[in-house]
């Protein structure tokens, strides 16, 4: 018996009956030989962790555009916090941690530079619109490994594309990630907003903090405990905690996410993304080689969207400067 088979047997003995079992996966788009050590979802987790798009998350905005300081969240730190919360819940409910972690780590791979401001900019430019969760799926299916994709399992791909809104994931692990994503971003965005000076913690709705707690740690713990207490046969959450959490999220949308400073910077994002988009549509051959090939194989608009959405904040700004800002001449 190889290590993978033994691990799958341990899953049968330890996971809850409504968990997603590795040996019952619906499979991959392209059949592969099984790994002798790792079950399929662990293998997916590893592929995501080692891919280029995952590394780029470290220089992609979470909420505040190009923040200075070492303590602000990036898209990468957000992803890691989502993974931690989701795995905590999965372990407590005896669900599949490997699947939970794979979805968590992959859920934002398609995010644009400059956070949701960049997403909105590309959404306006791209025919058919742009949604980061659909782009995340395109990244793992098509763009990684020079067009081969990561060939992830159906369950991970389903969790990626359903992590934010609309229809819920088909697996309980995917549904956990969706909840963990919201728990993570609302709470760490509060912390970052306070640090940035755009939010006074005393203004947080008292009816929300009375239920959820005064601190980030307390609020996260409250939500986790509520999920654990109301999940039996499926993932759920208590009505009181959920109502308070949604009200707190609405408060953040009404205050921090529409802060005048953030909105002023968003206009600059529109310009950077818009100018780069039009430039590369007219100069397809100046993109990286892979995207040039993609433009001729697929279509230029799709390739330009892929190229820009994959940029980090820093790379997008540097590229904009290289293309549109005159270079200095040193005259002796």
Can you say where each PLM-predicted feature lies in the sequence?
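Histidine-centered, transition-metal-coordinating active-site segments
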Residues: 1-79, 83-89, 96-97, 118, ...
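Short alpha-helix carrying the canonical HExxH Zn2+-binding catalytic motif
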Residues: 101-106, 179-180
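Short active-site segment of divalent metal-dependent hydrolases/proteases
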Residues: 110-114, 184
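A glycine- and small-aliphatic-rich helix-loop capping segment at beta-alpha/alpha-beta transitions
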Residues: 115-127
């Amino acid at each position: 018996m190889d290590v993978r088979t033994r691990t799958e047997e341990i899953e049968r003995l330890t996971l809850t009956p409504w968990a997603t079992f590795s040996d019952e996966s619906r499979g991959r788009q392209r059949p592969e030989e099984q790994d002798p050590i790792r079950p399929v979802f662990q293998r997916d987790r590893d592929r995501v962790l080692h891919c280029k798009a995952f590394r780029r998350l470290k220089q992609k905005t979470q909420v505040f555009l190009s923040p200075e300081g070492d303590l602000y969240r990036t898209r990468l730190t957000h992803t890691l916090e989502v993974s931690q919360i989701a795995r905590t819940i999965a372990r407590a409910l005896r669900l599949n941690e490997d699947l939970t972690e794979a979805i968590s780590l992959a859920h934002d791979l398609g995010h644009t530079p400059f956070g949701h401001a960049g997403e909105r900019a590309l959404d306006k430019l791209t025919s058919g619109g742009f949604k980061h969760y659909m782009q995340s799926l395109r990244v793992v299916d098509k763009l990684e490994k020079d067009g081969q994709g990561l060939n992830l399992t159906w369950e991970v791909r389903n969790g990626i594309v359903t992590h934010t809104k609309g229809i819920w994931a088909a697996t309980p692990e995917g549904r956990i990630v969706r909840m963990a994503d919201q728990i993570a971003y609302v709470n760490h965005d509060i912390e970052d907003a306070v640090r940035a000076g755009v939010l006074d913690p005393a203004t947080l709705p008292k009816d929300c903090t009375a239920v959820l707690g005064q601190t980030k740690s307390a609020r996260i713990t409250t939500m986790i405990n509520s999920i654990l207490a109301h999940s039996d046969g499926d993932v759920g959450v208590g009505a009181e905690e959920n109502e308070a959490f949604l009200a707190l999220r609405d408060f953040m949308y009404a205050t921090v996410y529409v802060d005048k400073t953030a909105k002023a910077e968003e206009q600059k994002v529109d310009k950077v993304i818009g100018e780069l988009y039009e430039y590369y549509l007219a100069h397809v051959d100046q993109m990286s080689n892979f995207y040039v090939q993609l433009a001729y194989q697929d279509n230029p608009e799709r390739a330009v969207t892929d190229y820009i959405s994959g940029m980090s904040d820093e790379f997008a700004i540097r590229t904009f400067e290289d293309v549109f800002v005159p270079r200095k001449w040193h005259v002796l």
